[in-house]
């Protein structure tokens, strides 16, 4: 299995970046910044350096709103994701990932009453097909990240999308913490995780790994926290990934400093050791 996360180095040298990942025990990486599709020499340098050090590129993130209410913005966002998938294909990244999007005009990843509508589902399908058909990737997948207040918000809804998009190049980016969007889910994260792997396992390309806590308050407040400080069943999550034949990478994210990433990494490694899972092979 492979664990990955951001590295904090002041260099854009591919060799330095690749070694920085291995120095942290990472064998998976996010796409380095500054790359664009068609930059053949730079892309080759990154591919060669990362392959030399046995570090795979887990995902190429393009974060925008593919359902932006502004039509001009939506078209520009769609073009950016098409370029992102083209880059992922050239780079050898496992996937290009974005959110499916929503109808909020105030926040690109915000809630909206129509985010779970049939119109949203149909647009998510249309956008995925448009992106994939424009690039026609042979290896990289296009994926949506699971989100708590827009589709796909659950394993079942993600499976519906996989079936509706009906493209071999459409895969699953698994972030099961984002499917913890109610007290019911929070108090049985194990069941949420189990459903994700049962319904989506064969389609999973890359996974985010973090934790979540429900705060003491009258209203429901769910907050991302450092791995090991919340209620997410990391043990079951790591075990679920390890149980997949193709062993998709696990990627740490959304932490504030190298020190926090180190603490999260050590916790995940400790959990993995307890269940007999190795990130070294």
Where are the model-predicted features located?
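N-terminal small/glycine-rich loop or linker at the start of catalytic domains
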Residues: 1-4, 58-67, 103-111
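Hydrophobic faces of well-ordered beta-strands that scaffold small-molecule active sites
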Residues: 2-7, 29-31, 57-62, 96-98, ...
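Acidic-and-aromatic substrate-binding clefts and catalytic sites of carbohydrate-active enzymes
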Residues: 7-15, 31-43, 65-72, 104, ...
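Active-site acidic/histidine proton-transfer and metal-coordination neighborhood
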Residues: 15, 52, 71-172
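Acidic (Asp/Glu)-rich catalytic clusters
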Residues: 17-24, 38-59, 83-92, 129-137, ...
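Conserved, mostly hydrophobic/aromatic
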Residues: 21, 29, 50, 77, ...
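Acidic/histidine-rich catalytic cores of soluble enzymes
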Residues: 29, 60, 126-226, 231, ...
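C-terminal helical cap(s) of enzyme catalytic domains, especially alpha/beta-barrels
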Residues: 261-280
């Amino acid at each position: 299995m492979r664990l990955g996360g951001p590295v904090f180095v002041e260099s854009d040298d591919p060799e330095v970046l690749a070694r920085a990942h291995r120095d942290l025990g990472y064998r998976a990486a996010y796409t380095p910044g500054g790359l664009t599709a068609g930059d053949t020499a730079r892309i080759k340098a990154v591919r060669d350096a990362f392959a030399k050090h046995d570090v795979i590129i887990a995902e190429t993130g393009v974060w925008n709103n593919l359902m932006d209410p502004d039509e001009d913005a939506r078209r520009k966002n769609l073009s950016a994701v098409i370029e992102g998938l083209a880059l992922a294909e050239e780079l050898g990244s496992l996937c290009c990932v974005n959110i499916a999007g929503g109808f909020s005009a105030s926040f690109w990843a915000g809630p909206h009453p129509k985010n779970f509508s049939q119109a949203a589902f149909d647009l998510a399908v249309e956008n995925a097909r448009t992106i994939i058909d424009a690039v026609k990737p042979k290896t990289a997948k296009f994926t949506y990240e699971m989100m708590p207040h827009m589709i796909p918000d659950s394993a079942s809804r993600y499976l519906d999308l996989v079936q509706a998009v009906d493209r071999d190049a459409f895969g699953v980016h698994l972030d099961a913490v984002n499917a913890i969007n109610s007290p019911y889910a929070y108090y049985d994260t194990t069941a949420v995780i189990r459903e994700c792997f049962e319904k989506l396992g064969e389609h999973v390309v890359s996974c985010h790994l973090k934790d979540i806590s429900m705060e003491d308050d009258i209203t429901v407040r769910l907050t991302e926290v450092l791995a090991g400080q919340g209620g997410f069943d990391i043990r079951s999550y790591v075990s679920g990934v390890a149980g997949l034949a193709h062993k998709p990478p696990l990627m740490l994210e959304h932490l504030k400093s190298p020190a926090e990433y180190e603490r999260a990494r050590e916790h995940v490694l400790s959990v993995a050791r307890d269940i007999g899972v190795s990130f070294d092979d």
